[in-house]
Amino acid sequence: MNLILLLVIGFLVFIGTYMILSINLIRIVIGISIYTHAGNLIIMSMGTYGSNKSEPLITGGNQLFVDPLLQAIVLTAIVIGFGMTAFLLVLVYRTYKVTKEDEIEGLRGEDDAK
């Protein structure tokens, strides 16, 4: 299971990097969103797999458990990531409405153009 999770996280980081390096603003926003999902999976994997974790208060039995603190952190990160994605989409939309450009190269000023 660790190998599958590692491959999924690596694939998400690869796709996120590829999308961030594109010149289209929407793809950049989607790439940042994919990065946040990869980060959430990394945090969740820290609490799932480990050595002999058991309940902190119950002494009978050796039931494995998942750390609830990491689940709360990931839930908070999902909400923050959603808000950040919504803000970036509105920013890209407003930039498109003002400049009629949806690519990075078109946003350069006359002084910066080569």
Curated annotation (Swiss-Prot):
InterPro entries: CPA3_antiporter_subunitC (IPR050601), NUOK/Mnh_C1-like (IPR039428). GO terms for cellular component: plasma membrane. The keyword Magnesium does not apply. GO terms for molecular function: antiporter activity. Keywords: Antiport, Cell membrane, Ion transport, Membrane, Transmembrane, Transmembrane helix, Transport. The keyword Transmembrane helix applies. The chain crosses the membrane at residues 3-23, 28-48, 72-92. It is a multi-pass membrane protein. GO terms for biological process: monoatomic ion transport. It is found in: Cell membrane. It comes from the Bacteria. Pfam families: Oxidored_q2 (PF00420). May form a heterooligomeric complex that consists of seven subunits: mnhA2, mnhB2, mnhC2, mnhD2, mnhE2, mnhF2 and mnhG2. Belongs to the CPA3 antiporters (TC 2.A.63) subunit C family. This is Putative antiporter subunit mnhC2.
